[in-house]
Amino acid sequence: MRKFTLSVALALGCTYSTSAQIPSLLQSKLINAQKIKTAAKEANDLWKPSHETLYMPNDNDGWTKDSEHYYTYDASGNILVSLSDDGKQKIKIVSTYDENGQLLTETTYRTDNGSDELKPRMMKEYTYDPYIHDLATSFFFSTISNGEWQHFYGSCYKRTVERDDQGRVTSITKSILDAPDHYTDQIKSLFTYNGTSKAPVSYEYQTSNGSTLTTSAKYVDLKWTKSTGEYLGAYSTNWFTNGNFLESATIKSDSYGDILLTATDKGNGSYEVEQTYTAESLKSQKEIQKYETLDDNGSFKYSDLFYFNIEGNAATEDDLYQGTIIETLYDDHKNIVLYESRNVSQTGIENAKIADGIRNEYVYGGEHGEITQTTTWNFSYNDNAYMPDSKVVADDFRNVSTGISHCTIQQESKHNASGVYTLQGVKIAQSATAHYPTAYTS
């Protein structure tokens, strides 16, 4: 039996970004987990905490102080320098931006036990495509070895973007640096177009099988009811939202034959996609993906459901076999209060079991409505319950929109902190509303 046509991660990944109001400590965790959907743009005044205290749960159902965190910002609210101190070790993270708010370099410094000297430990370096925001065309991850920066092979990569004479993207190839000056192609996306249209009529996604690239997914006969003409990347919710809507396509498969994709616009950002099989032997199967907007705060529910008729007849809504439901809720401040992933079985959607989840509770106690406390619970699959994870208390808020804060960085480091910065590997784009496909994010 065939499993899901497309993974939920690929289908949803590009919609996640960060709410600029979420505490700095939580931004890193939530973005890395890709569980945050884009929130509204910030107001002109950016009140940010220059200090946060992290507490962790203890065995007495209380909280124990874990570490102190200090920040300076640029005028856009991006973190210039973060300094964390848990009483045993200090960690400073400094990063530079380009004029578009894209992360250029990020250098991490740490102290050794018993010392207050911050020494460089690792560094990340990016370059970007000049036309597609946040699409890194190179990434280098380096660590200190014998006092010298050394690339960490297997983690560094480059992307080669090819365009036609009309400026449309025809292919993007990601290649991994696996040895000095040696790259191996890992994934490749190809797009074709008709006439002068900027909306693609075909899309192919290739992955490496060790020595060569082979086709993993191929979509042809793409028909759009509306398109912004902007680069959309891999198959995702971007194909059905934000001014784009793919009405139909054919998915080519050597194993399953042609799969017909038809989409219905439900209005207000909601849509439904049904995938059915043309092969007679697979008529008993189909897949339905639904994206539902739940309110004006950005809350949504996404479901990917697989139907299978055990008698071999055409699959109907009564033949639910398995699936996944992801629900993300936001409060009136556009901050996430719940992310929950549930597994669906033949027992029905109403009996779906929680597989993963994050729940946040905020205290908006600042003079200008700033978050002064955030308490987070993570779902424990073994305990089948939400368990306390962390508490962040923020204070000493500054209006960073009035100007850029400056910090002094060790001059012997490879990169001097003369530009704009961010925190702990988190790329905070200048525009909080941009979306980029998972297949192409670093």
Locate the predicted segments by residue.
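Bacterial Sec-dependent N-terminal signal peptides
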Residues: 1-27
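A short, compositionally biased
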Residues: 197, 268-270, 412-417, 432-433
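Residue-level detector of functionally pivotal "anchor" positions at catalytic/ligand-binding pockets or at interdomain
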Residues: 389-390, 395-427
